[in-house]
From Swiss-Prot:
Binds 1 [2Fe-2S] cluster per subunit. This cluster acts as a Lewis acid cofactor. The active site is at S518. It comes from Bifidobacterium adolescentis (strain ATCC 15703 / DSM 20083 / NCTC 11814 / E194a). One of its GO terms (cellular component) is cytosol. Gene3D superfamilies: IlvD/EDD C-terminal domain-like. Keywords: 2Fe-2S, Amino-acid biosynthesis, Branched-chain amino acid biosynthesis, Iron, Iron-sulfur, Lyase, Magnesium, Metal-binding. The gene is ilvD. This is Dihydroxy-acid dehydratase. Homodimer. Its cofactor is [2Fe-2S] cluster; Mg(2+). One of its GO terms (biological process) is isoleucine biosynthetic process. The lineage of its organism: Bacteria, Bacillati, Actinomycetota, Actinomycetes, Bifidobacteriales. Mg(2+) binds at D80, D122, K123, E492. It catalyses: (2R)-2,3-dihydroxy-3-methylbutanoate = 3-methyl-2-oxobutanoate + H2O; (2R,3R)-2,3-dihydroxy-3-methylpentanoate = (S)-3-methyl-2-oxopentanoate + H2O. Belongs to the IlvD/Edd family.
Length: 619
């Protein structure tokens, strides 16, 4: 197979291109080696990305040593935690598609032969995955790694262990805490570089990347602060050169992203996601990834999987365990191992480093006698409790692995943390095309809920009614016109879910939105309602006092109105202002462009390809 870069490295026509490569530091004697694009996302705004400049240099050196030509570039990264609660959050989800575009543009414009992606936080991971699946060249993912959890000591001497970003958000709405208490949380909940501690969106996506087969073992769970992460970066760099040579020298197309990320691989990844109670945002992103890969994987597949897979890992914010605890229990291969023993996975899939799932699990599942010493050692990587934005600050190890599948961080199928899966798809007259709830984070006592609606038309209005105590126990807060088109941008609702907990009513209210929730959200928080209000969805017809009925066991969500009543309301709405939010929000041209092409949440909130084809006139 001729390398993509061969056209530039040979012949008189492209002498100018070679001159530019020489000027950028490529030695002429290296012409003919595979050009490996390093898609980095270094960014000083985000603790999850602040160290990636060092990672990029490390990977670049390792690629060169392995026989490739490393060429590093950067794309953007939005910090959802910083963008949260104001109009900045409108830009988060749209950035995913722009990130995908930037990687595609850069790689194709410069004829790169292979790609190594260094994402970490929420939208960067799926954006790069979408690009890799579009490009379909040899690709390896290696993320920046998760942050350590913090330890907070309050002024009165109270010690709070395993605190994270969500704790400071809860604290900010707790009227019982003073400013000194709040400052103590603020200073300690994010102690290291890395993606926010807990099974939030970033860590969920990095785990999913490992499960689908495009990253090496440990990608989802080795802490950013641990020296073993440095080893992982080097191995990833060596692996991308190896598979580039397999493809171009040996005509082995099994190493390509689309050969790895088949429908069966998507089903395995989603099975793992449901089993670990990942962020609801993973549903949006895996649907978008499937479209980029031309794989027929839909919300119906996710709904089917959610009915058959229990939750066997309840990590923060849904449970007591931190990412480092999940790592000690064997990480993602530990979860996959339990699912494999239960017959829940397709075995005829492969990955960037193994020809079969069975071979990988034989080497990396700590519950198997065949598990390698390398794997056992890697899964001992522990927090170092060194407060620093620098990576690789320590070599701390746990005393032992967690092989307790009854009471440990990872359970076996016979002793699940929750008998139902950690994610569920609900449908009903309020969400005909579906909606999503993170069941792992919902207290069992409110899996069924019936209460009057309190309707708002923006996240800002939602925050106001929570903080001024308009939202009462027993109510269902309906937040509409925050979908992909209606927002536009489909904001996350972490502040509302955090503030109801801070107010002490987290187990007494429901939230429903055509927007989405942070991976850090928990409680009865139903998102991705489709169709959204701006697309004439029934959520646009709800009025204050309407009775909302939620039944997670039976997977339903309804408003107690007849079809005739809903039809009458629709006629009245369309005779009036129509499907328009009543709020004061200025929308930029950039966001209007996103809204113009955005599809519904049940389609991954991606751009509408048919509309693009129609308007462009291009096939």
């Amino acid at each position: 197979m001729e390398m993509r870069s061969a056209k530039l490295m040979n012949g008189r026509v492209f002498a100018g291109a070679r001159a530019l490569y020489r000027a950028a530091g490529v030695d002429g004697k290296d012409f003919g080696k595979p050009i490996i694009a390093i898609a980095n996302s270094f960014d000083e705004f985000l603790p999850g990305h602040v160290h990636l400049n060092k990672v990029g240099r490390l990977i670049s050196d390792a690629i060169k040593e392995a026989g490739g030509i490393p060429r590093e570039f950067n794309t953007m990264a939005v910090d959802d935690g910083i963008a949260m609660g104001h109009t900045g959050m409108l830009y988060s989800l749209p950035s995913r598609d722009i990130i995908a575009d930037t990687v595609e543009y850069q790689v194709n414009a410069h004829c790169a032969d292979a790609l190594i992606c260094i994402p970490n936080c929420d939208k960067v991971v799926p954006g790069m995955l979408m690009a890799a699946l579009r490009l379909n060249i040899p690709t390896v993912f290696v993320s920046g790694g998760p942050m350590e959890a913090g330890t907070t000591v309050l002024p009165d001497g109270t010690v709070k262990k395993n605190t994270d970003l969500i704790d400071v958000m809860y604290a900010s709405a707790d009227d019982n805490l003073n400013e000194e208490d709040l400052l103590a949380y603020e200073k300690t909940v994010c102690p290291t570089c890395g993606s926010c501690a807990g099974m939030f969106t970033a860590n969920s996506m990095n785990c999913l990347t490992e499960a689908i087969g495009l990253a090496l073992p440990g990608n989802g769970t080795i802490l950013a602060s641990h020296s073993y992460r440095k080893d992982l970066f080097k191995r990833a760099a060596e692996q991308v050169v190896k598979i580039a040579k397999q493809y171009y020298d040996d005509d082995d197309d099994s190493v390509l992203p689309r050969s790895i990320a088949t429908k069966k691989a998507f089903e395995n990844a989603m099975t793992m996601d449901v089993a670990m109670g990942g962020s609801t945002n993973t549903v949006l992103h895996i649907l978008a990834m499937a479209q980029s890969a031309d794989v027929d994987f839909t919300l119906d597949d996710i709904e089917r999987i959610s009915h058959t897979v229990p939750c066997i890992c309840k990590a923060s914010p849904s449970g007591e365990w931190e990412i480092s605890d999940v790592h000690r229990a064997g990480g993602i291969t530990g979860i996959l191992g339990e699912l494999d023993r239960a017959g829940k996975l397709h075995r005829d899939v492969h990955s960037i480093d193994y020809k079969s799932l069975e071979d990988k699990l034989n080497d990396w599942d700590i519950m198997r006698d065949t598990c390698t010493e390398e794997a056992k050692q890697m899964y001992l990587a522990a927090p170092g409790h060194i407060v620093s934005p620098e990576p690789w600050t320590h070599t701390t190890l746990f005393d032992s692995l967690d092989r307790d599948r009854v009471n440990g961080a990872i359970h076996d199928i016979d002793h699940p943390a929750v008998t139902e899966g950690g994610l569920a798809v609900l449908r009903g007259n309020l969400a005909p095309d579906g909606c999503v709830v993170k069941t792992a984070g919902v207290p069992k006592e409110i899996w069924t809920f019936r209460g009057p609606a309190l309707v708002v038309e923006s996240q800002e209005q939602a925050i106001e009614v929570i903080l001024n105590d308009t939202l009462k126990p027993g109510m269902a807060l309906v937040i509409r016109y925050e979908g992909p088109k209606g927002g536009p941008g489909m904001q996350e609702m972490l502040y509302p879910t955090s503030f109801v907990k801070g107010k002490g009513i987290g187990k007494q209210v429901a939230m429903l939105t055509d927007g989405r929730y942070s991976g850090g959200s928990s409680g009865l928080a139903i998102g991705h309602i489709a169709p959204e209000a701006a697309n004439k969805g029934p959520i646009a017809l709800i009025k204050n006092g309407d009775i909302i009925n939620i039944d997670i066991p039976n997977r339903t969500v309804n408003v107690e109105l007849s079809d005739e009543e809903l039809a009458q309301r629709r006629a009245e709405l369309e005779a009036g202002d129509g499907y328009v939010a009543h709020r004061d929000r200025k929308v930029s041209q950039a966001l209007k462009a996103y809204a113009a092409f955005a599809r519904s949440a049940d389609k991954g909130a991606t751009r509408d390809p048919e509309l693009i084809d129609k308007l462009s006139g291009l096939a």
